[in-house]
């Protein structure tokens, strides 16, 4: 199973990438600061997957990343 960190997982592009990774059976660590650009209602959908874990944090405060295959960064505000 692939392990991926997706930053900005509750935003427009990040939520799409999160959904695709979950549907492929990947283990997803979704990271989001949850600002005005986030859609927290997406957590209802993502939390239905056993292979999803949410981390509410600003990426500048991430001290480490567990062993993973990919990091996909969509953390940005426009």
Language model features with spans:
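N-terminal Rossmann-like NAD(P)+-binding domain of SDR-like oxidoreductases, especially those catalyzing
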Residues: 1-78
